[in-house]
Amino acid sequence: MFSGSIPALATPFRDGAFDEATFRRLVDWQIESGSSALVPCGTTGEASTLSNAEHHRVIEVCIEQAAGRVPVIAGCGSNDTRNALLHMNFSKKAGAAAGLCVAPYYNRPSQAGLIAHFSFLAENSDLPIVLYNVPSRTVTDIEDETVVELVTKYPDRIVAIKDASGDLSRVADHRMGIGRDFCQLSGNDELWLPHSAAGGSGAISVTANVAPALCAEFHSAIAANELARARELNDRLFPLHYAMFSDASPAPVKYALSRVMEEFTDEVRLPIVSASEASRKAVDEALEHAGLI
């Protein structure tokens, strides 16, 4: 379904508003650098502080600018099931290939609640769903048995998972419970290599925002079983993976983008604030280590 280096795009702001022109340039740069799909309005895109109108415009611009060159997996997550469906229906009409749907956060639903939430979305929208499991942010974990139940019940609707649990055993668990062809994407850049070795097909990546060509080359080496080359690229990228989270995300990502894209500002929305001096130092050192500045 999906594979390769898939950036979870940052949303550029200028003077408090969505900077559409810079976002279009970011989309072009990503595609020209080898990114295989794009994810607007995810965690890194500050979806939680976008209005619905802004959220939909970011998705719309991404799809317009991609112009069919790569698929767009639109961020459709919400802790309000009805609002998630609103995002999905808009994204379907706009031309998205799938919707990335995070486990509802703050509400802390049970596994039965998660099944009801994702079942409602699957039954009321034609947009394929990529499950997004990130318990460090949502508290609630989409357990393996829940994933298997959902995919078995809706095989044509729930088509992939982005797993950011950090538990590599889940790749094998999903392969055993669902099948080897089920699309599994890493949500942890630092685990991209072992996740792929276990059976994953790529990553929805934060680091790919600022190092799209390196990340695309890294995944190509993995796919070609060029382990020595993959390790070499992993070594170059590894400090950057951690630097992207050296302060509250996506502040370090936006600072890094401002260093590699002249027109990209490091502006974030409250309650996130700009990256600290220590974080900026870590980002600069990681960018230099990767050969990006």
Swiss-Prot record:
Keywords (A to Z) from UniProt: Amino-acid biosynthesis, Cytoplasm, Diaminopimelate biosynthesis, Lyase, Lysine biosynthesis, Schiff base
PROSITE patterns, per the entry: DHDPS_1
Pathway as given in its UniProt record: Amino-acid biosynthesis; L-lysine biosynthesis via DAP pathway; (S)-tetrahydrodipicolinate from L-aspartate: step 3/4
Site residues, Part of a proton relay during catalysis: T43, Y106
InterPro entries membership: Aldolase_TIM, DapA, DapA-like, Schiff_base-form_aldolases_CS
Subcellular location: Cytoplasm
Active-site residues from the entry: Y132, K162
Cellular component GO terms held in the UniProt record: cytosol
Chemical reaction(s) catalysed: L-aspartate 4-semialdehyde + pyruvate = (2S,4S)-4-hydroxy-2,3,4,5-tetrahydrodipicolinate + H2O + H(+)
A Pfam family matched in the record: DHDPS
Residues that bind pyruvate: T44, I204
GO MF terms held by the record: 4-hydroxy-tetrahydrodipicolinate synthase activity
Keyword Amino-acid biosynthesis attached: yes
Gene Ontology biological process terms in this record: diaminopimelate biosynthetic process; lysine biosynthetic process via diaminopimelate
Enzyme class: lyase
Source domain of life: Bacteria
EC number: 4.3.3.7
Role: Catalyzes the condensation of (S)-aspartate-beta-semialdehyde [(S)-ASA] and pyruvate to 4-hydroxy-tetrahydrodipicolinate (HTPA).
Self-association state and partner proteins as the record states: Homotetramer; dimer of dimers.
Family: Belongs to the DapA family.
HAMAP family referenced in this protein's UniProt entry, alphabetically: DapA (MF_00418)
Name the record gives this protein: 4-hydroxy-tetrahydrodipicolinate synthase
Species assigned in the record: Erythrobacter litoralis (strain HTCC2594)
High-level lineage: Bacteria, Pseudomonadati, Pseudomonadota, Alphaproteobacteria, Sphingomonadales
Gene behind this protein: dapA
